[in-house]
Curated annotation (Swiss-Prot):
Protein name in the entry: Nickel-responsive regulator
Residues that bind Ni(2+): H76, H87, H89, C95
Family: Belongs to the transcriptional regulatory CopG/NikR family.
Organism, as annotated: Salmonella arizonae (strain ATCC BAA-731 / CDC346-86 / RSK2980)
Keywords: DNA-binding, Metal-binding, Nickel, Repressor, Transcription, Transcription regulation
Length: 133
């Protein structure tokens, strides 16, 4: 491990210290390493041909005009990406789905875009994790 020195303005340093405290880091170096790893992992998932894993989460209105069947159709169209799906009934109208995906990150992003773009889908979020060798 090597030691490096960086210069931060006061506001950014205060934000880093606040983040470090909220997340329970023992020191700034641990926080900066995690932030950098996250940025590098996100960058790696943008490269075409990168294989990895992802978690897609979203909320949708299950009774909204054929929405559930459209989502299922999209899932079947991209069946090779699906590892597992968790379905949770939030309340009478809304459902939360969490899909674990694996495959080419470009294909995963395309699938996520297809689901999130459906009318009635809210709070869509894709978290990508490149496969580590």
């Amino acid at each position: 491990m090597q030691r490096v020195t960086i210069t931060l303005d006061d506001d950014l340093l205060e934000t880093l210290d606040s983040l470090s405290q909220r997340r329970g880091y023992n020191n700034r170096s641990e926080a900066i390493r995690d932030i950098l790893r996250g940025a590098l992992a996100q960058e790696a998932t943008q490269e075409h041909g990168t294989y990895g894993f992802a978690v897609l989460s979203y909320v949708y209105e299950h009774e909204k005009r054929d929405l559930a069947s459209r989502i299922v159709s999209t899932q079947h169209h991209h069946h090779e990406l699906s590892v597992a799906t968790l379905h949770v009934h939030i309340n009478h109208d809304d459902c939360l789905e969490i899909a674990v995906l694996k495959g080419d990150m470009g294909d995963v992003q395309h699938f996520a875009d297809d689901v999130i773009a459906q009318r009635g889908v809210r709070h869509g979020h894709l978290q990508c994790l490149p496969k580590e060798d």
